[in-house]
From Swiss-Prot:
This is Carbon catabolite-derepressing protein kinase. It comes from Candida glabrata (strain ATCC 2001 / BCRC 20586 / JCM 3761 / NBRC 0622 / NRRL Y-65 / CBS 138). GO terms for molecular function: AMP-activated protein kinase activity; ATP binding; guanyl-nucleotide exchange factor activity; identical protein binding; protein serine kinase activity. One of its GO terms (biological process) is response to endoplasmic reticulum stress. The lineage of its organism: Eukaryota, Fungi, Dikarya, Ascomycota, Saccharomycotina. It is a peripheral membrane protein. It catalyses: L-seryl-[protein] + ATP = O-phospho-L-seryl-[protein] + ADP + H(+); L-threonyl-[protein] + ATP = O-phospho-L-threonyl-[protein] + ADP + H(+).
Length: 612
């Protein structure tokens, strides 16, 4: 079957043969007992937020895996598909003993099937079965969770939805976190996901619909999880959602007397309402209670090495050989061309494409050092085995892939990493870990000022009046960059102006719902000879571009208008028209008209506002 070959052997041209990656049989017949690729499906394990999860085993090795079946309809617009598949491939690089591994991705016409590590139990079922959990035992689970979360944050992935269903246990009672990186894929481009999965575990800034949900939201959820393990009940729990939201927003909960001072102190610092004052993951790792009996392999490299870094002068760090083996791994996993990877690593240019490659390289490099750590830590040999079996053996096609061909080796022998990459590695604590941080996103969803909108805003019942939202940071010294247009006018006036401009330009829009007053969904006819698509020999022209315009509050009395491309429709009402184009065609096709129309709109707005 050509499917798995596709993953390991394609290079840079991988998006052109879009059919190459499809499984021949239609996968929606994913009945129990059927086969997908090399996997035999056994039964359905459950229904996740993204679709069904099935238990399966690899036909030759018998290894158990779980298949997470994501229906492409749930994902963003078809023209985002390529990016989503790219993000899912990035998740394949995440290797941490306490994160569910993603072994492979199988694509069919309607689904993306993620082949992931199988862990049979949920942590919380285990807690319920034990009548009492000692602090030692709870701390061991907590250390594993925090170490995994730190690892993902370091690689710029925030979970955003840590809750009991995502905390699994393997047969050695080790925690495995599921769904890392998925909330991203679901929300991308629409700054917010309105439904937050389980409100009991959600941070105040998440339930109040604040725009920016950074790594701090995971700290809050971990605080709730620690509380539940130690107290066997939820810190925030109420029949009434408004009351629940009010308690979370105000951080109202009680700590039982039996907790040790160390534990209750840590919980208090994690459940701080203002995300800026909340403890960071790195600070948790330095907490005294946390550090008791901490397994060596759970401490990230940089925390161990920090002291040495501080002593060294920066210069001698800068020369570092590029690891050829890692380049090979990278080109296999992500489908980059090897030369492309060397180019990115040697260049000091700051382009998105280069950064993507550098991040992936650093990620693989970290995996290596993590494995080295685990080898030194004698207690974890069995864990190491499961950690290293990156995927069912048959996936390691033939050994040739791992050895760079000789001439390739000669060509690149002793190549040097551009110093900027090394520096990034040496001081790679991401900006959000920096304690001196002053800058932070102050974008928030618009407070509602009209009575009928207030009613519609179901959250308002239980939340402090939205108008009290004040900017988190009022430091004015630094120029801020924003996408879209900024405005200091009254929000309703801004919306009015936009509607007038759209009307003048002949665009149409959907009637906004009361909850969604600050979002305009626009369809705009774009006439151009290039917008012809040939489909089944018939010319169809997708000439209606969809744009979403959204108004956000950046600071008090300072608003931002955001424009987002939202796909094409043809006048025939057949919105599926774009799916036959490859992702490349789609993106080259859409960028220019989108910029063209938004520029027209911005000009129109400028003309109008001067006229007033």
């Amino acid at each position: 079957m050509e499917n798995k070959e596709h993953h390991h052997h394609h290079h840079h041209h991988h998006h052109h043969h879009s059919n190459g990656s499809y499984v021949s049989n239609k996968v929606s017949s994913l009945a129990d007992g059927s086969r997908v690729g090399n996997y035999q499906i056994v039964k359905t394990l459950g229904e996740g937020s993204f679709g069904k999860v099935k238990l399966a085993y690899h036909v030759t090795t018998g290894q158990k895996v779980a298949l997470k079946i994501i229906n492409k309809k749930v994902l963003a617009k078809s023209d985002m598909q390529g990016r989503i598949e790219r993000e899912i491939s990035y998740l394949r690089l995440l290797r941490h003993p306490h994160i569910i591994k993603l072994y492979d991705v199988i694509k069919s016409k309607d689904e993306i099937i993620m082949v992931i590590e199988y862990a049979g139990n949920e942590l919380f079922d285990y807690i319920v079965q034990r009548n009492k959990m000692s602090e030692q035992e709870a701390r061991r689970f907590f250390q594993q969770i925090i170490s995994a979360v730190e690892y993902c944050h370091r690689h710029k992935i925030v979970h955003r939805d840590l809750k009991p269903e995502n905390l699994l246990l393997d047969e050695h009672l080790n925690v495995k976190i599921a769904d890392f990186g998925l909330s991203n894929i679901m929300t991308d481009g629409n700054f917010l996901k309105t439904s937050c999965g389980s409100p009991n575990y959600a941070a105040p800034e998440v339930i109040s619909g604040k725009l920016y949900a950074g790594p701090e939201v995971d700290v809050w959820s971990c605080g709730v999880i620690l509380y539940v393990m130690l107290c066997r009940r939820l810190p925030f729990d109420d029949e009434s959602i408004p009351v629940l939201f009010k308690n979370i927003s105000n951080g109202v909960y009680t700590l039982p007397k039996f907790l040790s001072p160390g534990a209750s102190d840590l919980i208090k610092r994690m459940l701080i309402v203002n995300p800026l004052n909340r403890i960071s993951i790195h600070e948790i790792m330095q907490d005294e209670w946390f550090k008791v009996d901490l397994a060596e392999y759970l401490v990230p490299q940089d925390l161990k090495q920090q002291e040495q870094f501080n002593k060294k002068s920066g210069n001698e760090e800068n020369v570092e050989e590029i690891d050829d083996e890692m380049v090979v791994t990278l080109s296999k996993t992500m489908g980059y061309d090897k030369d492309e990877i060397y180019e990115a690593l040697e260049s000091s240019e700051d382009t998105p494409a280069y950064n993507e490659i550098r991040n992936a390289y650093i990620l693989i490099k970290d995996n290596k050092s993590l494995i080295k750590d685990m080898k030194q830590d004698n207690n974890v040999t069995q864990e190491l085995d499961t950690f290293l079996s990156q995927s069912p053996p048959t996936f390691q096609q033939n050994g040739d892939g791992m050895k760079a061909s000789e001439d390739q080796k000669k060509k690149h022998s002793g190549r040097r990493l551009a110093s900027s990459v090394t520096q990034q590695r040496t001081f790679h604590q991401p900006p959000f870990m920096d304690q001196s941080k002053e800058e932070d996103s102050t974008i928030s969803i618009l407070p509602t000022s009209l009575p009928q909108i207030h009613r519609a805003n179901m959250l308002a019942q239980g939340l402090p009046a939205a108008s009290k939202i004040s900017p988190l940071v009022t430091k004015k010294s630094k120029t801020r960059w924003h996408f879209g247009i900024r405005s200091r006018s009254y929000p309703l006036d801004v919306m009015g102006e936009i509607y007038i401009a759209l009307k003048n330009l002949g665009a149409e829009w959907a009637k906004p719902s009361e909850e969604d007053l600050w979002t305009i969904r626009v369809r705009w006819k774009y006439d151009s000879d290039e917008s012809r698509l040939i489909e089944d020999g018939v010319k169809k022209i997708p000439n209606l571009m969809k744009i979403v315009i959204q108004l956000f509050q950046i600071e008090t009395n300072n608003y931002l208008v955001d424009f987002k491309f939202d796909g094409w429709e043809s006048t025939y009402g057949d919105s599926t028209i774009s799916t036959n184009m490859s992702e490349d065609e789609m993106s080259t096709f859409s960028a220019y008209p989108f910029l063209h129309l938004t520029t027209k709109l911005i000009m129109e707005l400028a003309v109008n506002s001067q006229g007033n």
